[in-house]
Amino acid sequence: MAEMATATRLLGWRVASWRLRPPLAGFVSQRAHSLLPVDDAINGLSEEQRQLRQTMAKFLQEHLAPKAQEIDRSNEFKNLREFWKQLGNLGVLGITAPVQYGGSGLGYLEHVLVMEEISRASGAVGLSYGAHSNLCINQLVRNGNEAQKEKYLPKLISGEYIGALAMSEPNAGSDVVSMKLKAEKKGNHYILNGNKFWITNGPDADVLIVYAKTDLAAVPASRGITAFIVEKGMPGFSTSKKLDKLGMRGSNTCELIFEDCKIPAANILGHENKGVYVLMSGLDLERLVLAGGPLGLMQAVLDHTIPYLHVREAFGQKIGHFQLMQGKMADMYTRLMACRQYVYNVAKACDEGHCTAKDCAGVILYSAECATQVALDGIQCFGGNGYINDFPMGRFLRDAKLYEIGAGTSEVRRLVIGRAFNADFH
């Protein structure tokens, strides 16, 4: 508890210190969108957690939300690195990292809250944040040796570096252990050949955690996987042009190419041929933290839809007073609140040392599918305006759909849950 209090004060100090400084060039303050209140008494949050949400919401609605439509339209976040340093100053890039490396030493519930609020302002930037803070930083915290942590964490946590993680390949998505990227040991180095695909933050990343096959004959195949820390600029490593995606536009994604890429043996994360343990343990927490993304998108839909229903008129009255629209509001709200309770409680359990693959898969399965439905309902409430790109409703739908595919598809999540029950009766 004392460590938590210290970390909370540290984060509070960073927030206070940021307020004393003018924003970076290019971050012109704009009138924030009118937000619906979030009842965190019902959500069971502590006073410190409520303050964290309020601080992040204020900052993000002023400095990110007004840019979200343009980020989506252009598929580019022009001020990404400056914004990343602002997040670093706020202490949220390394929110679960130890204080000794510059982190805030907080828990997964706080991580989910920040993920939610960033996604509320911009789903795309929220996804990039999740890849950086959880897939990269948290994996280094949990699996890196002391030298690796001292070398990489401070710059990743400050926002000087951008991080990523690379598992998937063109023919190895859900079946990730069938990956073909090969790592051959030669002296004190490994030579990597192959490629990775659909890598979030790939075009921008300075540090990447990359999984490769070090034993092609291993049975089962999962026993021959090793995790490596790869730096931008290493000989033989390059990236292709960023992908033109349906949604999450501005969260840059690309193919990684390895052509006789020379990686020092000291850059193995964990142990040789034991990368599957790094991968699978990290996947549970990835699903948990990324579940904050659909929460933020659902809240954004409500932020825009509920006020609209009480401004738009038809048949001589505000359309929000029609019973069919009241039903839409009720459905959207209850889906969001049910998802929040599930996600927050699983996060609390993980903070207390009780983390299950079944429920980490469950929270993103349920919240992702609810987010898609809530976005569809929001479009319906907007009517013709919901189908026009001058309004953000289409963006919410396109962004929400990613969470039914990334971090393991909805189908794979159902398998994880079903197999967990089967194991109880084996």
From Swiss-Prot:
Transit peptide: 1-32
Presence of keyword Lyase: no
Effect of residue 379 to T: In IVA; uncertain significance
Residues binding substrate: 174, 222-223, 277, 284-287, 407-408
Cellular compartments annotated: Mitochondrion matrix
Reported function: Catalyzes the conversion of isovaleryl-CoA/3-methylbutanoyl-CoA to 3-methylbut-2-enoyl-CoA as an intermediate step in the leucine (Leu) catabolic pathway. To a lesser extent, is also able to catalyze the oxidation of other saturated short-chain acyl-CoA thioesters as pentanoyl-CoA, hexenoyl-CoA and butenoyl-CoA.
Subunit structure: Homotetramer.
Protein name: Isovaleryl-CoA dehydrogenase, mitochondrial
Organism: Homo sapiens (Human)
Gene name, Swiss-Prot/TrEMBL: IVD
